[in-house]
Amino acid sequence: MAGISIFGLLPFTSPDIVAVNVSHIFLQMALWRSSDNLVYLPPTPVSKVLSTDDYVTRTNIYYYAGTSRLLTVGHPYFPIPKSSNNKVDVPKVSAFQYRVFRVRLPDPNKFGLPDARIYNPDAERLVWACTGVEVGRGQPLGVGLSGHPLYNKLEDTENSNIAHGPIGQDSRDNISVDNKQTQLCIIGCTPPMGEHWGKGTPCRNPPAQGDCPPLELITSPIQDGDMVDTGYGAMDFTALQLNKSDVPIDICQSTCKYPDYLGMAAEPYGDSMFFYLRREQLFARHFFNRASAVGDAIPDTFILKSNGGGRDVGSAVYSPTPSGSMVTSEAQLFNKPYWLRRAQGHNNGICWANQLFVTVVDTTRSTNMCLCVPSEASPATTYDATKFKEYLRHGEEYDLQFIFQLCKVTLTPDIMAYLHTMNSSLLEDWNFGLTLPPSTSLEDTYRFLSSSAITCQKDTPPTEKQDPYAKLNFWDVDLKDRFSLDLSQFPLGRKFLLQLGVRSRSAVSVRKRPATSATGSTAAKRKRTKK
């Protein structure tokens, strides 16, 4: 009888098994530890934004629409209130303001169409697509000056021979500049967005008196009358320059905005900017430094002080005066047609909500008209400057022309859900309502809502549709009665037909006189011979 012993088991005996040598086996369990590396989940898929070409069908019907001559006149630097109250008597009209036209279009679904069979009103809706635009500008080219009678100027740092000593209490001077030259045109179906630097909110304790405030980049819609960047930066001068002397008077109490091209280009649906035209020109004309105490002192490691009683270090807060230089008709962006074939975003020119926003800036026609009138009733016989009054006015002239293409949208369930996600008011404008799922909770409904015996009930929402841009200021242009199919009767329409290669036939047929056949024989000429 032999015995077998295995580690971990009790020995047992068997008469039929011979003795076998078995070595001991030791099993050691490993301790599992989680990895110190971060576990990254797969990225969330980005919701796909469709191009309007994927669900909008274009027809071969084009309309022309144009405005009348649009004029505006005012003071180029500031609004002038009435003497009796604070109402504005003369508005501020400057070439360095944005002109944002809100163009209202007729509803194509309620429009008199040449052929009613082009779409099915039960399953389709009509929309406008902007395919051509021309922004006309009147008035001659000119340069309008801006400035400040008390401009914060300490020294001419370009031509100064020696730095000045301690600054006085008031070293301001009367300085005028010709601002930065800008030509801009933005087309979209929502207002354009602008950006500027404003006063931010500190994270900890508020800054002490005299400390530099934090800055914040603010994005807001560009409205009609907002100031453009004139060469001093896009910032809120009212909140960030409290001395009211660092910039010209036309912007010292304003906010200069710069178009947020990056934000509008990254917009998912591409409604605020179908395309844009831009030309900017600027150079520094004069170089000054600022008065007042320097907030950020120059470190001692940056300069070497002179021996003995050296002079004080001057102000290192430098600031140039801008200049837009020469204006010329060869560099004009206006008074010429532009055809929209492919937009930069997903919206290829579709005018949702039957409206279009045209943003224009043109500083090449910035002439300020000087008006002089006598202050006395008697006619002047000799010149006396005290007997005359000088006034400033600025006038602008615009003309907008468009070519619109009639398009239709097939309202499938997927397209309707997509449009509702993009803009929920579109389906409401098309008389489509959404049925909300029934509520599973028990709600209270009182019978007499106006009774004083019950608690005050919530006000019912207004039935009228609210204008989302009611609180914004735009130049409203109504084109609901200015659409025409006769493209050949309008300047932009003829240019559009010409670039399509379509010739308009004359309505008057010209009758040609048939050639008469010669019945008689012509006499042969005798050949001259020299004798």
UniProtKB/Swiss-Prot annotation:
Coiled coil: none
InterPro entries: Capsid_L1_Papillomavir, Capsid_L1_sf_Papillomavir, dsDNA_vir_gr_I_capsid
Keywords of this entry: Capsid protein, Disulfide bond, Host nucleus, Host-virus interaction, Late protein, T=7 icosahedral capsid protein, Viral attachment to host cell, Viral penetration into host cytoplasm, Virion, Virus endocytosis by host, Virus entry into host cell
Chief localization: virion
Domain of life: Viruses
Single GO biological process annotation from the record: virion attachment to host cell
GO annotations of cellular component type: host cell nucleus; T=7 icosahedral viral capsid
Described purpose of this protein according to its UniProt entry: Forms an icosahedral capsid with a T=7 symmetry and a 50 nm diameter. The capsid is composed of 72 pentamers linked to each other by disulfide bonds and associated with L2 proteins. Binds to heparan sulfate proteoglycans on cell surface of basal layer keratinocytes to provide initial virion attachment. This binding mediates a conformational change in the virus capsid that facilitates efficient infection. The virion enters the host cell via endocytosis. During virus trafficking, L1 protein dissociates from the viral DNA and the genomic DNA is released to the host nucleus.
Protein family per UniProt: Belongs to the papillomaviridae L1 protein family.
Subunit structure: Self-assembles into homopentamers. The capsid has an icosahedral symmetry and consists of 72 capsomers, with each capsomer being a pentamer of L1. Interacts with the minor capsid protein L2; this interaction is necessary for viral genome encapsidation. Interacts with protein E2; this interaction enhances E2-dependent replication and transcription activation.
This protein's name: Major capsid protein L1
Organism in which the protein naturally occurs: Human papillomavirus type 10
Gene: L1
